[in-house]
Design a protein with these regions (language model features):
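Bacterial N-terminal signal peptides
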Residues: 5-17
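CBM-like carbohydrate-recognition segments
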Residues: 21-55, 64-107, 113-128, 286-299, ...
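Long, well-ordered core segments of solenoidal/helical folds
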Residues: 22-41, 75-93, 124-143, 176-205, ...
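Aromatic (Trp/Tyr) and acidic
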Residues: 55, 62-70, 110-116, 152-184, ...
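Oxyanion-binding "anion nests"
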Residues: 231-282
Length: 330
């Protein structure tokens, strides 16, 4: 529920910035505030914690705030961050020894609140997360392990969990050298995790080829998960927003986004306007069209067009609009 709410807010907020339509994202944002007024996302048997699910939800609220400039939306974001960031910049509940990229994601909201308020505690918290990434274990090729407990493995999820935060931090504090490694992480996934026949990206890559699920030749996992590829697509458009226009790898990232968009459009379900959970096995028993992943693709396609990374006439734009209007955002 938390991830679904976040992805719908983000998808609809960005889409409505591209097409004139009713403010579906505003309705979703209102429902989020009503459901979790204290700023901590809780569900049954889940009391709420510093985690990527809440971070992604706040990303959606940030997108909505950028579209409307409503003070209540920013207050909600700040209140949520303040539940975890103490006066000395410590992040309550953060498990540093886990080295999980998932726990970096909420740093984006911390950075946003710092840029608006300039309060030192938010800078300290963001700096701590940046320093955590400096300690992140890496594969032999230099890619981030997804977590300490997943050695030598890159997951597409990690692209979104870490790289947009890193890009925002690098741009905010003029750490230009960081953009080289940000591009390296994303382009390593593009090179190693994309199926050359379909253009789709596999969810995981074990460079050591030791995991039971890893192909003994490529190290890749067997399935193409829509949500995983959605994470990667969103990471690309969000990183490019911060990426220096004169950086030598910017064009490579735009090209990776175009490859991703082309593949996503090719495997979109023409009947529903959504994407199947296992993207290349549409209609198979047990498979289903997945709303969170569809919202992710809507977000990436719409923002990619709006920012000029994808062509205005791209078929994916119309597919994204139909999906958001008719199936997901209502």
């Amino acid at each position: 529920m938390r991830l679904f709410a976040a992805s719908v807010v983000m998808g609809c907020a960005v889409a409505q910035g591209l097409w004139a339509q009713d403010a579906s994202s505003a309705k979703m944002a209102e429902s989020v505030i009503k459901a979790w007024p204290a700023g901590v996302v809780t569900t049954e048997n889940h009391p709420g914690e510093w985690a990527y699910e809440e971070g992604v939800l706040l990303d959606g609220m940030v997108a909505q705030w950028h579209a409307t400039a409503t003070g209540a939306d920013f207050k909600y974001i700040k209140d949520a961050v303040d539940k975890y960031v103490t006066e000395d910049g410590t992040i309550k509940g953060y498990k540093a020894d886990g080295h999980t990229l998932d726990d970096i994601e909420m740093g984006r909201a911390v950075l946003l609140v710092y840029r608006v308020t300039q309060q030192p505690k938010y800078y300290k918290a963001a700096k701590f997360l940046q320093e955590q990434l400096a300690l992140q274990p890496r594969t032999a090729s230099g890619g981030y392990w997804h977590k300490q407990i997943y050695p030598n493995q890159m997951w597409l999820d990690g692209a979104y969990m870490a790289e947009p935060f890193r890009a925002a931090y690098a741009a905010t504090f003029q750490e230009r050298g960081d953009f080289d490694d940000i591009a390296k992480q994303l382009l390593l996934m593009d090179a190693k995790m994309r199926d050359p026949k379909t253009g789709l990206l596999l969810h995981g890559w074990d460079e050591s080829k030791q995991m039971p699920w890893a192909d003994k030749t490529t190290g890749l996992s067997p399935e193409v998960w829509a949500r995983a590829m959605g994470w990667y697509a969103m990471a690309l458009v969000d990183v490019l927003e911060w990426f220096p226009k004169d950086h030598p790898t910017r064009a490579d990232l735009v090209a990776a986004l175009n490859r991703t968009a082309t593949a996503a459009v090719a495997y979109q379900d023409k009947k529903t306007g959504l994407w199947w959970q296992v993207m290349d096995k549409g209609g198979k028993p047990g498979n289903y069209t997945e709303a969170s992943a569809s919202s992710m693709f809507v977000y990436a396609l719409a923002k990619g067009v709006r920012m000029g990374y994808l062509p205005q006439s791209d078929e994916g734009v119309e597919i994204g609009r139909a999906s958001c209007r008719e199936r997901v955002c209502r």
